[in-house]
C-alpha cells in the first residue's frame, strides 16, 4: 500500500522536497538555499531536504546554482514482488498531480531482486499510471521522453520504492546558454558550487577573476552571473512543474519578473572576468556561450596560453584564479602535463599574490606540482571522474617565501636527479669531443627507477620499461613521476621537451606501433650524417643509439664498396655508407613506414636514388632470390617477428644460422658481413664459427653511453675463410 506524502489543499501547502546536487557540495547548496530564505533544511548524501511552500519551491528552482534537480516525493511503499511495484504506483492519487491528457516520462533508478533492470521498472510504472487514468476517465497519458509535461522519477532502494515528481524536468545545470553536443565541458552547477566554495558570489568583495585554461568558459559565465545577481533559471525554456496540476502560473511569473529586475547593471559592476585557452575550438565555444548568456561586454576571452598572455591585473585588488586544467587519461599524458602544472603554479605565485586560487583535477600527482601546499580540498565527481578541488593558501596574502620556494621534488626525485647529473658529467667530455647530439644518459641504473633516458639535442626521450606484476602499480607510477620531475632540473632541459613512452615486450605488428597521426619530427646529426627522428609518434625514434659505433665502422669501411643493408629500418647505416664513399647501397625492409622513412633519410643527405636504393621486401625471401654480390653487408634483424608480410615467423636465436648463410652467399670475394642483434640471451651457432671467420666485436661497438650494458646488442664481423 502506498504512503501518500503530498496532498493538494491550497497554495499554502507545505512540501517536503529533495534537492539533489553534485557530491561534495551539499553544504554549499544548503548555504545557498538559506541565502534565499529557505532555511528548513536537512543535509543528505548529494542532496538537501527542504521543507517549504509553493513559493519556496519556485525559488529553489529559479535561484539555485548548485542544485541538479528539485524532486517532490509523492509516495513511497514497500515492494516484495514486481506486482507490488505496479500496485503501489497505481494506488497514488495521480489526478492530484496531472491530467490524462498530459505527456509523461518515467525515469527509474535502482534495481532489486524483483526489478532487475530499470527499463522494466519504468514500463511497469507507466502501465500502472495508464491503467489508473483509464479506470478514471477512459483516457491515458502518452509518453514523451524529451521534455514531457510531467516527469516522474522512480527510485528503488532495497525493498522500498519512492515515487517523485521531477519539478526541474531536466538537470538544472542546463541554464539555456550552452549549446548541447560537441565538447563535454564542466557542468554549470558543479562550476557554480566550486566558485561558491572558493569564496566567489554576489557582493563577495573580490573584483577580479581569471581562468587561465577556460575551455568553453563555464567558470567565467557562472561567476559573472553570480556577480550580476542573474537567476540561473531565468533563461531555461523548460521546467517539469509547468504541466504539474498544482503549478501556479501567476506566482511563477511574478517571481520571474522579480528576478529580471533584481539583475544588476553590468556597467556598474566594476569586476574583471578574463580567460585564456590555447585551443581554438574551446575559445570559439566560450565566445558563443558568453554571447548566449548576454555577457559579451562583461567577459574577455583570448586564444593564448596563460604564460604568453598579458592579463589586465590590478595588483592592489583581490581576485580569484580558478581553473580546470587537463588531467591526463593515459600515463603518458600525465607525464606530459607535469610541465603545465608546474608552470601554472609558478605563474600564480608570480602574478596573483593575494588572490584566492582553486584548481580542479583528478590527479594528485599533478596537483603536487603546484609549489604550494593546498589549504583544503573538496572531493567531487566531474564527468564520471573522481576529482578534487584544491584551495591554496598562498593567496590569502600571508604566504611564507620558503613555501613558495620549496622544491617540488620528493627525496626520491632528488636522489634520481643526483644520479642523472653524475651520469651526464661522466659523459660530458666524450659528448663534446665527438660532437654527439644523441646519446643515452640513463638506463635503469637504479632498479627502482626502471627507465631509459636518451638525449636528442635539447630533448629528453624517456622510455619506461614495463614493471613486473609484483610491483605495486601506484608505487611504479609515483616513481615515474619522480623521474619526470627530476629530468628538467638535472639535465637543464625544458619540461615541455621531455617525452615519455612506455616500453614492453613487443610482438608482431606492435613493433611498428604508431601512437598518433601527427608527425613530430626533427633532424639530428651524427658523424657528418643527418637523420630524421620522431620522438613522439612511434615507439622507436628512427635512430638506434646503441648502434652508433657500428654505423661509424660502416662509414670507415665503405669507401668504394657495394653496400647491402638488410632489415634496414630507417637506413641510417646506408647513409653512413654513403658518407663513407660507398659506390652504391641497397636498403631492404618489409615495413612501408620505414622504407619511406629510409628514402627520406637518403634524400636528406643528397645521395642519388640511382645509386642508393630502397626496396620493400621480406629480407629472407629476398636473400633466397637475389643473385647480386656486395662487398659489405649489414644485417640487424629483429629478435622476433610474425608479420603477415613475412612468409614465416622469425625467431633470431633459432633462425640466425640460416640468415647468416644466406647473407654470406651474397658476399663478394673479400667481403664482410656485419651481423648484429639485440637478443640479450643470444648465443651464436657454433657451426657458423666452423664455416666462417667470425670475430665478436661487441665490446668494440659499445660507446661510453652504453658500456654499462654489454647485452644491449651482440655484434660480429663474419668473413668467408
Swiss-Prot record:
PROSITE patterns in the record: THUMP (PS51165)
What organism does the record attribute this protein to?
Marinomonas sp. (strain MWYL1)
Keywords annotated in UniProt: Cytoplasm, Methyltransferase, RNA-binding, rRNA processing, S-adenosyl-L-methionine, Transferase
Domain THUMP, by residue range, is 56-167
**Alphabetized PANTHER family for the sequence:** RIBOSOMAL RNA LARGE SUBUNIT METHYLTRANSFERASE K/L (PTHR47313), RIBOSOMAL RNA LARGE SUBUNIT METHYLTRANSFERASE K_L (PTHR47313:SF1)
- Tell me where in or outside the cell this protein is found: Cytoplasm
Q: Which reaction does it catalyse?
A: guanosine(2445) in 23S rRNA + S-adenosyl-L-methionine = N(2)-methylguanosine(2445) in 23S rRNA + S-adenosyl-L-homocysteine + H(+); guanosine(2069) in 23S rRNA + S-adenosyl-L-methionine = N(2)-methylguanosine(2069) in 23S rRNA + S-adenosyl-L-homocysteine + H(+)
Among Gene3D superfamilies, the record links this protein to: 3.30.2130.30, RNA methyltransferase domain (HRMD) like (3.30.750.80), Vaccinia Virus protein VP39 (3.40.50.150)
**Per its UniProt record, what Pfam families does this chain match?**
Methyltrans_SAM (PF10672), RlmL_1st (PF22020), THUMP (PF02926), UPF0020 (PF01170)
Q: Name one GO cellular component term.
A: cytoplasm
Cystine links in this protein are: none
SUPFAM superfamilies linked to this entry: S-adenosyl-L-methionine-dependent methyltransferases (SSF53335)
Q: Which top class of enzyme applies to this chain?
A: transferase
List membrane-spanning regions. none
UniProt lists the family membership as follows:
Belongs to the methyltransferase superfamily. RlmKL family.
Query: Protein name, please?
Result: Ribosomal RNA large subunit methyltransferase K/L
Amino acid at each position: 500500500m502506498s504512503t501518500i506524502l503530498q496532498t493538494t489543499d491550497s497554495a499554502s501547502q507545505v512540501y517536503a522536497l529533495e534537492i539533489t546536487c553534485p557530491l561534495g557540495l551539499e553544504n554549499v547548496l544548503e548555504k545557498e538555499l538559506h541565502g534565499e530564505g529557505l532555511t528548513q533544511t536537512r543535509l543528505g548524501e548529494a542532496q538537501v531536504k527542504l521543507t517549504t511552500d509553493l513559493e519556496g519551491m519556485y525559488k529553489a528552482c529559479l535561484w539555485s546554482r548548485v542544485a541538479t534537480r528539485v524532486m517532490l516525493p509523492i509516495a513511497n511503499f514497500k515492494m516484495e514482488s514486481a506486482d507490488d511495484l505496479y500496485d503501489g504506483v497505481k494506488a497514488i492519487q495521480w489526478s492530484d498531480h496531472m491530467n490524462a491528457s498530459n505527456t509523461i516520462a518515467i525515469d527509474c533508478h535502482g534495481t532489486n531482486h524483483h526489478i532487475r533492470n530499470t527499463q522494466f521498472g519504468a514500463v511497469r510504472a507507466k502501465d500502472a499510471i495508464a491503467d489508473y487514468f483509464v479506470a478514471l476517465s477512459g483516457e491515458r497519458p502518452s509518453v514523451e521522453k524529451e521534455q514531457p509535461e510531467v516527469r516522474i522519477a522512480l527510485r528503488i532502494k532495497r525493498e522500498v520504492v519512492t515515487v517523485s515528481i521531477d519539478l526541474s524536468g531536466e538537470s538544472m545545470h542546463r541554464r539555456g546558454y550552452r549549446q548541447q553536443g560537441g565538447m563535454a565541458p564542466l557542468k554549470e552547477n558543479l562550476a557554480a558550487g566550486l566558485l561558491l566554495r572558493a569564496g566567489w558570489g554576489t557582493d563577495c568583495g573580490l573584483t577580479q577573476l581569471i581562468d587561465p585554461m577556460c575551455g568553453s568558459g563555464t567558470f567565467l559565465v557562472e561567476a559573472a552571473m553570480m556577480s550580476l545577481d542573474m537567476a540561473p533559471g531565468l533563461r531555461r525554456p523548460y521546467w517539469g512543474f509547468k504541466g504539474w496540476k498544482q503549478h501556479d502560473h501567476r506566482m511563477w511569473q511574478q517571481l520571474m519578473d522579480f528576478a529580471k529586475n533584481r539583475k544588476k547593471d553590468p556597467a556598474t559592476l566594476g569586476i574583471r572576468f578574463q580567460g585564456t585557452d590555447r585551443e581554438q575550438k574551446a575559445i570559439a565555444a566560450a565566445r558563443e556561450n558568453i554571447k548566449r548568456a548576454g555577457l559579451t561586454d562583461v567577459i574577455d576571452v583570448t586564444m593564448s596560453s596563460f604564460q604568453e598572455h598579458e592579463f589586465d591585473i590590478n595588483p592592489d585588488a583581490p581576485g580569484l584564479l580558478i581553473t580546470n586544467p587537463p588531467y591526463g587519461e593515459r600515463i603518458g599524458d600525465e607525464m606530459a602535463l607535469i610541465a603545465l602544472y608546474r608552470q601554472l603554479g609558478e605563474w600564480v605565485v608570480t602574478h596573483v599574490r593575494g588572490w584566492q586560487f582553486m584548481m580542479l583535477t583528478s590527479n594528485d600527482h599533478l596537483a603536487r606540482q603546484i609549489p604550494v601546499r593546498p589549504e583544503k580540498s573538496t572531493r567531487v565527481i566531474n564527468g564520471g571522474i573522481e576529482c578534487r578541488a584544491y584551495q591554496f593558501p598562498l593567496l590569502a596574502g600571508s604566504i611564507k617565501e620558503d613555501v613558495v620556494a620549496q622544491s617540488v621534488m620528493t627525496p626520491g626525485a632528488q636522489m634520481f636527479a643526483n644520479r642523472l647529473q653524475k651520469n651526464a658529467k661522466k659523459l660530458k667530455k666524450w659528448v663534446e669531443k665527438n660532437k654527439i647530439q644523441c646519446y643515452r644518459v640513463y638506463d635503469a641504473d637504479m632498479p627502482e627507477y626502471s627507465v631509459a633516458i636518451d638525449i636528442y639535442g635539447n630533448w629528453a626521450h624517456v622510455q619506461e620499461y614495463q614493471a613486473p606484476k609484483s610491483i605495486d602499480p601506484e608505487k611504479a607510477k609515483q616513481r615515474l613521476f619522480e623521474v619526470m620531475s627530476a629530468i628538467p632540473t638535472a639535465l637543464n632541459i625544458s619540461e615541455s621537451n621531455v617525452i615519455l613512452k612506455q616500453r614492453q615486450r613487443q610482438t608482431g605488428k606492435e613493433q611498428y606501433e604508431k601512437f598518433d597521426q601527427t608527425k613530430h619530427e626533427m633532424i639530428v646529426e651524427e658523424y657528418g650524417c643527418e637523420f630524421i627522428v620522431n620522438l613522439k609518434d612511434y615507439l622507436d625514434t628512427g635512430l638506434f643509439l646503441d648502434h652508433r659505433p657500428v654505423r661509424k665502422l660502416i662509414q670507415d669501411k665503405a669507401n668504394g664498396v657495394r653496400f647491402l643493408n638488410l632489415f634496414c629500418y630507417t637506413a641510417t647505416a646506408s647513409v653512413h655508407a654513403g658518407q663513407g664513399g660507398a659506390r652504391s647501397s641497397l636498403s631492404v625492409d618489409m615495413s612501408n613506414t620505414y622504407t619511406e622513412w629510409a628514402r627520406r633519410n637518403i634524400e636528406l643527405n643528397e645521395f642519388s636514388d640511382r645509386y642508393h636504393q630502397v626496396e620493400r621486401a621480406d629480407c629472407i625471401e629476398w636473400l633466397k632470390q637475389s643473385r647480386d654480390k656486395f662487398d659489405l653487408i649489414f644485417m640487424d634483424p629483429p629478435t622476433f617477428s610474425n608479420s603477415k608480410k613475412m612468409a614465416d615467423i622469425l625467431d633470431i636465436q633459432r633462425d640466425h644460422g640460416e640468415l647468416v648463410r644466406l647473407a654470406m652467399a651474397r658476399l663478394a670475394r673479400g667481403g664482410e658481413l656485419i651481423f648484429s642483434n639485440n637478443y640479450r640471451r643470444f648465443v651464436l651457432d657454433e657451426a657458423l664459427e666452423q664455416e666462417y671467420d667470425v670475430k665478436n666485436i661487441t665490446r668494440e661497438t659499445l660507446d661510453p653511453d652504453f658500456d654499462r650494458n654489454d647485452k644491449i646488442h651482440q655484434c660480429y664481423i663474419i668473413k668467408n675463410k
